[in-house]
Amino acid sequence: MTAAADGGLERARRVLALARRVVVLAGAGISTDSGIPDFRGPQGVWTKDPGAERLATLDAYMTDPEVRRRAWQVRLHSPAWEARPNAGHRALVELERDGRLTLLVTQNIDGLHQLAGNDPHRVVEIHGTMRDIVCMRCGARTAAPAVIERVRAGEKDPHCETTFEGANCGGILKSATISFGQQLSVIDLARAQLAVEDADVLLCVGTSLGVYPAAGLVPLALAAGAKVVIANAEATPFDDEAAAVVRGALSEQLPRLVEPIAEGPAAES
């Protein structure tokens, strides 16, 4: 770790040590050390294969059976099914146990925060989850493994098998993730915004802060008087406005970042 990076970590520790209400905004960078590639980084899914972005576009998915077939094969072979939380995820669990984490807003769809031990009621999956499947016609929701097994057994483009008055719905099935062209949950976004407006610190981890509306939480936090701490491998558009910037692998840096939390005001009360 360079001296500059070490200084950023120490500044971030001091900021967190004074905070009572911390909101975390997490991105794909926190899961890369669990074996899940990010999307826009140097080795990102869309960086290496720009055509893959079409699989995450709602209009293409709904109108093109071949896109759906490819998407189901990607889901079937996703490394996320075998991935396990890393030390970065566990550090955020410690932040919650410390009593300062008010909300964890994640752009990730892998569910690793909950697997690590974060309270699901304190996690907002603003881009949805890959662990559920939803019917685009009737809205029926089911756990993903059941549908994934249908694909493994040979179905190329599975459709909804929910029955209504003896008839199958037959609607298009899709992972319960937010695709390009699909609206975010108004409730989830409102929860995130309200929490940020009440926070002392917005801790951004593993996110390029280039995707809106999630990235819009940063100016919202700054306008509300909160400090922003950014921990990310690459530069972000908000680095100059942050109280501290931490570089390096999050599985190494986040445990160091939360270590001194017990020395803060919450431990004295």
Model-derived features with residue positions:
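Conserved catalytic core of sirtuin-type NAD+-dependent deacylases
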Residues: M1-S269
